């Protein structure tokens, strides 16, 4: 919803989702004991936090674009890059064949465009991973179907809250379209996005659709 104050907020969370263990510095699990201690809640977030009827009631990482962390894009040396929109710039770099470390819940994913054979080969070289298969992240279960067989059970696994990597039988043409991803294997490891940053990258690639488009 473009009218929502958290539209495209990369750190959105509630008591039902978002990081817990990975931002905890010590117990008890209260905001001052987490990496969110440096971010004071704005009045709107404070009202949500204090309202027992709100889904963000006592959500320790509660924040919004006005009071929470900010996205940043850095080069390989750790220097911040002056970009207007880190998500849009990251997508552009991936589409140009670059390799990007994308922050996850507890670490980083080294990501590249899986349809770019040269980028995949470069990632293999940097990881010293000559043959071990890579998993591919897709926007949704429907977007997996052209590359692998997705039955009802597989779809349920892909969409499970744990967001596992699911091994699926490859379709004809998969190896040509995703060259170098899973060489010599009959199955493709597929997964769906599970963090706001991952969702935002696919959302950006789709043209920032509103609602349920």
Cite the ranges covered by each PLM segment:
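Active-site-adjacent structural elements in enzyme catalytic cores
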Residues: 1-213
């Amino acid at each position: 919803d473009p009218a929502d104050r958290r539209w495209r907020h990369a750190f959105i969370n509630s008591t039902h989702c978002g990081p817990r263990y990975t931002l905890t510095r010590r117990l008890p699990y209260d905001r001052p004991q987490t990496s969110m201690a440096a971010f004071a809640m704005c009045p709107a977030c404070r009202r949500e936090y204090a309202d027992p009827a709100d889904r963000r009631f006592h959500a320790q990482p509660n924040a919004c674009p006005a009071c929470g962390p900010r996205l940043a894009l850095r080069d390989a040396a750790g220097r911040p890059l002056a970009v207007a929109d880190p998500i849009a710039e990251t997508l552009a770099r991936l589409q140009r064949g670059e390799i990007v470390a994308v922050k996850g819940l507890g670490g980083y994913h080294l990501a590249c465009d899986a349809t770019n054979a040269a980028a995949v080969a470069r990632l293999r070289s940097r990881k010293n991973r000559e043959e071990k298969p890579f998993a591919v992240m897709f926007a949704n279960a429907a977007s997996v179907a052209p590359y692998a067989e997705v039955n009802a059970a597989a779809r349920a696994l892909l969409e499970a809250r744990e967001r596992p990597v699911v091994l699926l039988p490859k379709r004809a043409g998969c190896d040509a379209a995703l060259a170098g991803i899973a060489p010599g294997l009959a199955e493709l490891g597929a997964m769906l996005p599970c963090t706001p940053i991952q969702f935002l990258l696919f959302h950006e690639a789709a043209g920032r659709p509103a609602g349920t488009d």
